[in-house]
């Protein structure tokens, strides 16, 4: 059988990669070679489409920034030696900063002892992390299922809700327009972006979407489901929509949804994959509203920016449906020792360093500054909004938002648009960001807006920044 990749030697590939992995420093020649190799690998073996969305990739495709190492809790360096202030935070994974030394130390200690679990013996850190989350999460959430990502934590939540509600004849889920819950089949059924959904239709049946923040629309949908016998098993929401554009709901919305769930016997699933672990100024965003879910989804920052881990935390009443057969829903690597070590150290960092409080303090300063800029440039900006250090600037056109992000990149500040709302540029730095760094962001943002204000009225100039 002929192989189209017969010219490739896998041993040479691994040896070349290991050379770079084990290199503390790179010579200029090594940097240039690595940069070109990575661009080639993405183009030929990963997905060339990704290069179209990188702010660092030039029109000719001859340059793309390749990250090399973290240079501090809030900064990273590329292979060319450029240092960037990270205001994207890996979409919210670096809450305790890049390469947090205490998280790394915990993982290294576990790595030296036993990297992965045997599956048959009881792994201690999984138990200790579950106990920690029971103590950390609001209300009477108690039992935890561990996975490897946010979409997996949502899948587990949906399956858990189905297992609990199916004997009660309830199979329907209600989510929100603008929602993002992941891209695996079940999570995608709750996600609302048409571009992500259409190629995989039909998705799972029994999902409805209503306007986020509109309790009247939610109640009408529940009532309509009841009229047709499609009783609601669960309502799944993000307390604040992240990929929808950092949409903060009315203050009474989540309490009203909680009351509606109690009224009709539906479960409330809150997806705090992005809003959890101190991001919004409290450990969990639902705490701003005094609301406790029946099932809570966590991931992203739970691993401290060192290990991937997801968690689905539920009340005993709900989780007990898995007691009889704990193998109904499992995953090989979920709750592995390295991930649990990272998560335990992350929680410790958040608590001992008061990082949720820091997010509230620095977030208030940053948001006030962004809102002042929005008032100065209403022709460009609709509004700046957010909570804690989950913030967004919504521009009047997609092209303006992309141009803003690209100009900030040229000034060595990383930001990005949100997946479901291209006009909204998110600002989501590590919770360790300093006041001085926040001030730098505001200064550079003001300079960029001043520049764009002079160029954006010319539609021909805007084509340079357009994203098809």
From Swiss-Prot:
It comes from the Bacteria. PROSITE patterns: AA_TRANSFER_CLASS_3 (PS00600). Keywords: Aminotransferase, Pyridoxal phosphate, Transferase. Pathway: Amine and polyamine degradation; putrescine degradation; 4-aminobutanal from putrescine (transaminase route): step 1/1. It catalyses: an alkane-alpha,omega-diamine + 2-oxoglutarate = an omega-aminoaldehyde + L-glutamate; putrescine + 2-oxoglutarate = 1-pyrroline + L-glutamate + H2O; cadaverine + 2-oxoglutarate = 5-aminopentanal + L-glutamate. Its EC number is 2.6.1.82, 2.6.1.29. Belongs to the class-III pyridoxal-phosphate-dependent aminotransferase family. Putrescine aminotransferase subfamily. Pfam families: Aminotran_3. The modification N6-(pyridoxal phosphate)lysine is found at residue 300. Pyridoxal 5'-phosphate binds at residues 150-151, 274, 332. GO terms for biological process: L-lysine catabolic process; putrescine catabolic process. GO terms for molecular function: diamine transaminase activity; identical protein binding; putrescine--2-oxoglutarate transaminase activity; pyridoxal phosphate binding. Its cofactor is pyridoxal 5'-phosphate. SUPFAM superfamilies: PLP-dependent transferases. It comes from Pectobacterium atrosepticum (strain SCRI 1043 / ATCC BAA-672). Catalyzes the aminotransferase reaction from putrescine to 2-oxoglutarate, leading to glutamate and 4-aminobutanal, which spontaneously cyclizes to form 1-pyrroline. This is the first step in one of two pathways for putrescine degradation, where putrescine is converted into 4-aminobutanoate (gamma-aminobutyrate or GABA) via 4-aminobutanal. Also functions as a cadaverine transaminase in a a L-lysine degradation pathway to succinate that proceeds via cadaverine, glutarate and L-2-hydroxyglutarate. This is Putrescine aminotransferase. HAMAP family: Putres_aminotrans_3.
């Amino acid at each position: 059988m002929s192989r189209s990749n017969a010219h490739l030697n896998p041993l040479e590939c691994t040896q070349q990669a290991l050379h770079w992995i084990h290199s503390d420093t790179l010579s200029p020649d090594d940097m240039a070679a690595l940069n070109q190799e990575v661009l080639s690998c993405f183009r030929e073996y990963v997905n060339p489409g990704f290069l179209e969305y990188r702010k660092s990739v030039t029109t000719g495709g001859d340059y793309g920034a390749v990250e090399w190492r973290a240079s501090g809790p809030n900064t990273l360096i590329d292979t060319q030696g450029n240092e960037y202030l990270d205001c994207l935070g890996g979409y919210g994974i670096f809450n305790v900063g890049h390469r947090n030394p205490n998280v790394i130390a915990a993982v290294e200690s576990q790595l030296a002892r036993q990297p992965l679990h045997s599956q048959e013996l009881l792994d201690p850190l999984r138990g200790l992390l579950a106990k920690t989350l029971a103590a950390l999460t609001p209300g009477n959430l108690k039992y935890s299922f561990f996975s490897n990502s946010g979409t997996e934590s949502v899948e587990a939540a949906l399956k858990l809700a189905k297992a609990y509600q199916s004997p009660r004849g309830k199979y329907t889920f209600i989510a929100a327009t603008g929602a993002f819950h992941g891209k695996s089949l079940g999570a995608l059924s709750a996600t609302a972006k048409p571009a992500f959904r259409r190629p995989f239709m039909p998705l799972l049946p029994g999902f409805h979407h209503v306007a986020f923040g509109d309790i009247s629309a939610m109640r009408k949908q529940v009532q309509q489901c009841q009229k047709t016998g499609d009783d609601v098993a669960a309502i799944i929401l993000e307390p604040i929509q992240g990929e929808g554009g950092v949409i903060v709901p009315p203050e009474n919305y989540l309490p009203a949804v909680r009351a509606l769930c109690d009224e009709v016997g539906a479960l409330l699933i809150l997806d705090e994959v992005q809003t959890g672990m101190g991001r919004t100024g409290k450990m969990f965003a639902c705490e701003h509203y005094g609301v406790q879910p029946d099932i809570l989804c966590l991931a992203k920052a739970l691993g401290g920016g060192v290990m991937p881990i997801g968690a689905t935390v539920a009340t005993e009443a709900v989780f007990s449906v898995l007691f009889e057969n704990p193998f109904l829903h499992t995953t090989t690597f979920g709750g592995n020792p390295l991930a649990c070590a990272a998560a335990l150290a992350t929680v410790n960092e958040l608590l001992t360093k008061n990082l949720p409080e820091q997010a509230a303090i620095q977030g208030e300063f940053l948001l006030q500054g962004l809102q002042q800029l929005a008032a100065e440039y209403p022709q460009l900006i609709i509004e700046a909004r957010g909570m804690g250090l989950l913030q967004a600037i919504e521009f009047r056109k997609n092209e303006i938002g992309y141009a803003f992000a690209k100009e900030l990149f040229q000034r060595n500040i990383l930001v990005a648009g949100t997946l479901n709302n291209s006009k909204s540029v998110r600002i989501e730095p590590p919770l360790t960001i300093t006041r001085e760094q926040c001030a730098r962001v505001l200064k550079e943002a003001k300079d960029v807006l001043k520049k764009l204000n002079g160029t954006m009225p010319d539609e021909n100039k805007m084509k340079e920044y357009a994203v098809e």
